[in-house]
Amino acid sequence: MLARAARGTGALLLKGSVQASARAPRRASSGLPRNTVVLFVPQQEAWVVERMGRFHRILEPGLNILIPVLDRIRYVQSLKEIVINVPEQSAVTLDNVTLQIDGVLYLRIMDPYKASYGVEDPEYAVTQLAQTTMRSELGKLSLDKVFRERESLNASIVDAINQAADCWGIRCLRYEIKDIHVPPRVKESMKMQVEAERRKRATVLESEGTRESAINVAEGKKQAQILASEAEKAEQINQAAGEASAVLAKAKAKAEAIRILAAALTQHNGDAAASLTVAEQYVSAFSKLAKDSNTILLPSNPGDVTSMVAQAMGVYGALTKAPIPEAQDSVSSRSSRDVRSTDASLDEELDRVKLS
């Protein structure tokens, strides 16, 4: 009988502990788990136990045994991350603009003892602290900075909450601003400001585009002129090189002709052949003078071909008086010998010209 009674009592205690753990933890005394001697604490929860009205210990997750009548579960704290909606409130910025702003608060209980005995309602206390801190931080910023520095504002609110909530055993993980509502007039002025800023930006971009276009056109003209001047320079250099090559080639050809002529003059009857050539060229050049309509100078007796030939021979004779030093003796020795034959041949040539 005693064994059956013990088993029945154990079953009742186990059933009571399971029912207590299934209920949601609340601060009201009616919602707290009862002391059934054997208790099972759920994961991520901390049960604060008082013995005879004083703090005794904190029950960890798992199996726990309490003394009936003496021990009492006074608080149940959740160690999970808690999400709290901060109600919408009004705040005044540094430039005297009234805003309606709300947010979301993420916190976690780090010390169940401080959360139980440090403050009456930790969640409500943190919510009120978040609202007051948010109003204080918004008063330090202008309206433009509130929108631009939203992340830094959230970080400042988190730091301020953690400094004040440390004695409550609560840590604020993050704070996020949800909505910021501005007055209608301020909203209209902000729209006008945005439109003006856009027009200004469009004007600046258009002017920059015009400037860049002008710079590109000028740069293109500059490059074109540089390339044209370089091309002209290269053309002049090539033309000069071609002319120099032509002059050099002509000079070489003339020098070769002179060398061949000099070599021919040193041969037998070279003077006679040279005299005949000079006479022919003189007569030919004189006969071409009448073909041009230019003012010319005629000899004193243009009808006398003999005098013309004699004059040409005189010119050649004057040229042959200053021969090359090496060939001077040979030319002078042959000149006396060939004069008669040269004169005779010239006379015959002149007679044929007269008869024709």
Curated annotation (Swiss-Prot):
Pfam name, any one: Band_7
Sequence positions bearing Phosphoserine: 17, 330
Matching InterPro entries: Band7/mec-2_domain, Band_7, Band_7/SPFH_dom_sf, STML2-like_C, Stomatin_HflK_fam
Subcellular location: Cell membrane; Mitochondrion; Mitochondrion inner membrane; Mitochondrion intermembrane space
GO MF annotation terms: cardiolipin binding; T cell receptor binding
Region annotation Disordered: where it falls in the sequence: 326-356
UniProt cross-references to SMART domains, sorted A to Z: PHB
Subunit structure as annotated in this protein's UniProt entry: Forms homooligomers. Interacts with MFN2; may form heterooligomers with this mediator of mitochondrial fusion. Interacts with PHB1 and PHB2; stabilizes and recruits them to cardiolipin-enriched mitochondrial membranes. Interacts with CACNA2D2.
Family assignment from sequence similarity: Belongs to the band 7/mec-2 family.
Protein's recorded name: Stomatin-like protein 2, mitochondrial
